[in-house]
């Protein structure tokens, strides 16, 4: 009995909430003068709680008591700001190397050039995934391959919370497709539990406050579509009962 309890305890301890977010270029960063720009700070509110922050992902991380953040971004994304934000004792030389690299990169740069950026987040809660711009099918296929690396960062039982506030608008669609494939075809029992969006565009109508919108209805629609397919094709109503 004790062995079973220890096994259950170990399984529970491995389960975690993981934020997956997209990282943009942060239009307020002055790369030429190496100014450490960032997203504009605002007062986010979610579940009747307020958080003053620049990153929606950081708000979600704290609000849901997550374990780590997987940031998906290009070589031009503001990794320097993320480094400043999440590394306990930032090294100015490391930051400068990141900033200079970002400034020199473009859409044609090979993703392997960003290996030093990835290494700079070792032993932190940040897990970077580098992607291309997705300008054509070849780049989109490469991005899909990159996103499959997320599977290695997840443990069985993990809950995924997706933040779609920033980054290229096409990427959340690609991400959800990849995650659904991982969920259906890999042995890890992971699930997407939430999709959120920081609606900064209407903060001027909300007295400067920015709502974090819950888009879980999309997950429900997807689940219903799957259940309908199972029922119509195989007469299986089990998923409906869930």
Predicted regions located by residue number:
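Short glycine-rich anion-binding loops that position phosphate/pyrophosphate groups of nucleotides
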Residues: 25-26, 166-168
């Amino acid at each position: 009995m004790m062995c079973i309890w220890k096994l259950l305890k170990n399984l529970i301890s491995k389960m975690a909430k993981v934020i997956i977010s997209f990282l943009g270029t942060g239009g307020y960063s002055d790369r030429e003068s190496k100014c450490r720009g960032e997203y504009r700070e605002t007062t986010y509110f979610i579940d009747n709680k307020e958080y003053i922050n620049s990153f929606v992902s950081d708000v979600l991380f704290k609000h849901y008591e997550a374990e780590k953040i997987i940031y998906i971004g290009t070589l031009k994304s503001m990794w320097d700001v993320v480094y400043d934000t999440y590394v306990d004792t930032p090294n100015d030389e490391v930051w400068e190397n990141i900033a200079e690299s970002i400034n020199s990169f473009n859409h044609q740069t090979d993703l392997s050039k960003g290996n030093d950026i990835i290494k700079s987040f070792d032993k932190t809660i940040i897990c970077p995934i580098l992607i291309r711009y997705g300008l054509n099918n070849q780049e989109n296929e490469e991005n899909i391959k990159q996103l499959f690396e997320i599977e290695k960062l997840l443990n069985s039982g993990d809950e995924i919370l997706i933040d779609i506030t920033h980054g290229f608008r096409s990427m959340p669609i690609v991400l959800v497709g990849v995650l659904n494939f991982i969920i259906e075809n890999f042995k890890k029992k992971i699930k997407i539990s939430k999709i959120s969006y920081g609606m900064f565009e209407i903060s001027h109508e909300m007295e400067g406050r920015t709502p974090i919108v819950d888009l879980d209805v999309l997950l429900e629609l997807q689940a219903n579509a799957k259940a309908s397919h199972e029922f119509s094709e195989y007469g299986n109503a089990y998923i409906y009962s869930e």
